[in-house]
Design a protein with these regions (language model features):
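Predominantly soluble domains enriched in secretory-pathway, periplasmic, or organellar proteins
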Residues: 1-207
């Protein structure tokens, strides 16, 4: 299931039947937008949540990621700050996919790239020109032996192609497993740039 909450009253607004294990949910930050999106790990679907003409929230199955029969396992998703596109990572095949979300009820896949043997988290910069990836999902589920990629990779995005900027091999550096990232360049309450005295940074947490 997917549950939409009213954070002011701390009560659920609506409970949706979302088969296939929805993992991450994201809201569009584009001014004027009022929709959210999730993906399902086991069925490789994209679901969008929007209000209908009566103000009732509805769930829409709007897309399929990869070949569901092979269980690519969609894990992390990240909407770009303009709300026009979304990165989707699939863990089992190590792929990242860019979807055009300018019409959220009719999204289209526009780009794919293999990041490694496995890939988990994705975090685009607020200007959309850089994209960061880490690889570990859960230690017991990560690939084994030579396929056990544990890295942070940073790419530059020119609108057409991801080009590797740098990478950190967590196994080589004895840093553990590269799981979660937090990229911060703006105040998340106002979406305004942080003060010049505070530099933008990437925090990486290993699990």
């Amino acid at each position: 299931t997917t549950v939409m909450w009213d954070y002011k009253s701390m009560k659920p607004i609506k409970i949706f039947n979302t088969p296939g294990a929805a993992l991450e949910a994201r809201w569009s930050f584009k001014p004027g937008d009022n929709w959210a999106v999730t993906t399902t790990a086991l069925t490789s679907n994209i679901y969008v949540y929007k209000q209908d003409d009566k103000g009732e929230w509805q769930q829409h199955n709007v897309g399929t990621i990869g070949d569901p029969s092979k269980i690519p396992l969609p894990v992390d998703i990240a909407l770009n700050s303009d709300g026009k596109s979304m990165w989707i990572n699939t863990f089992m095949d190590g792929m990242t996919r860019l979807w055009d979300m300018s019409d959220p009820l009719h999204p289209k896949e526009t780009y794919t790239k293999k990041i490694g043997n496995q890939v988990n988290m994705v975090s685009p910069s607020f200007d959309g020109k850089r994209v960061y990836y880490t690889t570990s999902l859960v230690s017991n589920w990560d690939q084994k032996n030579q396929a056990n990629d544990q890295f942070l990779k940073a790419y530059n995005w020119d609108g057409k192609e991801l080009k590797l900027a740098f990478e950190i091999d967590f196994l080589k550096e004895k840093l553990g497993r590269a799981h979660h990232m937090k990229f911060q360049a703006r105040d998340l309450k106002t979406l305004q740039p942080l003060q010049a005295s505070t530099t933008a940074k990437v925090n990486v947490v290993s699990n």
